[in-house]
Amino acid sequence: IRRDSIDKERYLIDIQDLNWIRVGNSHEWRIGIRREFWGVTETAHRVDILNQTDQVESFDGEDKLGQPMVNFSLSKDWGTLDVYALLGFRERTFAGELGRLRSPAVINTDLAQYESAADYHRTDFAIRWSQSYQDLDLAISHFSGTSREPEFRLMEHKGETTVVPFYGLIDQTGLEVLYILGGLAVKFEGISRSGQSSRFSAATAGFEYTQVGILGSRFDLGWLMEVNHDDRLPSSPIALGTRFTFNDLYDSQILSGVLWNEQSGETSVFVEASRRIRECCKLSLEAIYFNGGHAGYDGYRMLEYFDQDDFLRFEFIYYIGN
């Protein structure tokens, strides 16, 4: 349950995880509402498509809405095969007129449009194969259905022009690769998608190198770098960051970094920190700073709308039953 004293578009009642699970010798049935994450990279989640993004909750796209689904999972020597029937569609959340972060134009979610005649009642389908080969993890997936990422259209409503989301039908094939070599983790995820105007590809690749027990302590320090590419954009950012792990009883860690677009000069600096409190609670902090880049640059800017905005979230979680 979420309420907001300023922006009513943040109001939310959402069941995120509620499942019936039946386990067999080499298979599982999972029926209910779930959140399931696909992907291996940190700064962009290309293949993660089953759940809708709760965009008003966080800028990075990692917060998701629960998705009603039926999932059959089969585990064999040749890998794990998951088949999904996704029952109904969840619309993406957008900030209202008084909310942040948002685009200059308020998105009218009450007038959302769909390519499918079934609107938000459509059942979508997905399949994913994954396998581990010693130090190598692979996954191949395919999704067919209503895109979780809307396009935006102008329409006349009550004598005024308004911006509405349009959810088209897509087919998306994804690839995930994770290779571990000692303290080095090499990561890649990419997609090819058809159905939104023309086919396009997008990918994120990079590495994370972890120094274990720095300076003879129990602390670990990870260094990460990722590059991004999207056929739809003239340029994409490079990400540099660090992950500091305390290796204590409370799973304390700090992830920080910067996304930098060489062409436009745009940057965003982010910090994510979390720590458990005993067995009952968890504290987390998320902060993002935006910089608009070169003053004389007149090309496409990914962060143009956020130049005057920054983001800070502090969260306290209490786990019922502890």
Predicted regions located by residue number:
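Residue-level signature of outer-membrane beta-barrel architecture
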Residues: 21-24, 33, 73-76, 130-133, ...
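Outer-membrane beta-barrel translocator domains and adjoining extracellular loop/strand segments
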Residues: 6-14, 42-48, 94-100, 151-158, ...
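Outer-membrane beta-barrel "beta-signal"
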Residues: 207, 306-322
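Outer membrane beta-barrel
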Residues: 1-101, 134, 288, 292
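Repeated loop/turn-to-beta-strand initiation elements of outer-membrane beta-barrel proteins
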Residues: 26-29, 78-81, 135-138, 183-187, ...
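Detector for outer-membrane/organellar transmembrane beta-barrel domains
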Residues: 181-262
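Transmembrane beta-barrel strands of outer-membrane/channel proteins
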Residues: 1, 31-35, 83-87, 140-144, ...
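Residues that define the transmembrane beta-barrel architecture of outer-membrane proteins
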Residues: 11-16, 23-25, 64-68, 75, ...
